[in-house]
Design a protein with these regions (language model features):
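Conserved acetyl-CoA-binding loop of GNAT-fold acetyltransferases
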Residues: 6, 132-142
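C-terminal "cap" of GNAT-fold acetyltransferases
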Residues: 3-9, 144-163
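Conserved GNAT acetyl-CoA-binding A-motif
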Residues: 108-121
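Hydrophobic alpha-helical core bundles mediating ligand binding, dimerization, or RNAP-core interactions
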Residues: 33-41, 104, 108, 132
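Short amphipathic alpha-helix that is part of the acyltransferase structural core
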Residues: 2-45, 153-154
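Conserved beta-strand-loop-alpha-helix junction that forms the acyl-donor binding cleft
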Residues: 118-129, 146-147
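Conserved acetyl-CoA-binding loop-helix of GNAT-fold acetyltransferases
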Residues: 87, 93-106, 134
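Acetyl-CoA-dependent GNAT
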Residues: 24-79, 83, 88
Length: 163
């Protein structure tokens, strides 16, 4: 894949954010994630199902207050899929989304996955498209999602997990 310019990248350039902690949380502690999901996306559903292999739920807190989340799971033997994530409105553009992405990617790499993937809707969430392009992700697919009535982009990036 390197011959196509698709090389694994080192850790993302995440700024130091004083007071920020990111932790993996169990399904039993989803209340804050559900609340943030409603506030950010105006919908109850976080993801279609939590019955996924290698389910990972990360919660970001700033000075103890929940400010963001990221949810992902195994898509295939080599691919980990980040299904959803978000940052509360008053904390956007502070590096929290990048910190969540970096944290999840490091955990995924430690589990041995070779590819980290996510989909985004550029007309709804243009920041994720920019974040992907600025951090070594490759656009690998574009299609139309009839549920959201929007175009969807698929981004992937290789991890440094050994083959």
């Amino acid at each position: 894949m390197e011959r196509f310019g698709y090389t694994p990248a080192a850790s993302l350039s995440v700024p130091v954010i004083p007071g920020l902690t990111i932790a993996s949380i169990p399904l039993s502690q989803l209340d804050d994630v559900r609340r943030m999901n409603r506030d950010i996306f105006s919908e109850e559903r976080v993801i279609n199902s939590f019955e996924k292999e290698d389910l990972m739920i990360l919660e970001a807190r700033l000075d103890g207050e929940p400010v963001g989340f990221k949810v992902g799971y195994r898509e295939s033997k080599k691919v980990f899929y980040s299904a959803k994530g978000g940052v509360v409105a008053d904390q956007r553009r502070n590096g929290i989304a990048l910190a969540l992405l970096d944290d999840m990617m490091r955990r995924v790499e430690e589990k041995g996955y070779h590819v980290f993937a996510f989909d985004t809707f550029p007309n709804l969430h243009p920041g994720m498209t920019i974040l992907a392009m600025e951090n070594g992700f490759r656009l690998v697919k574009a299609d139309y999602n009839a549920v959201y009535k929007e175009f969807r982009l698929r981004f992937e990036r290789r991890t440094q997990a050994p083959f």
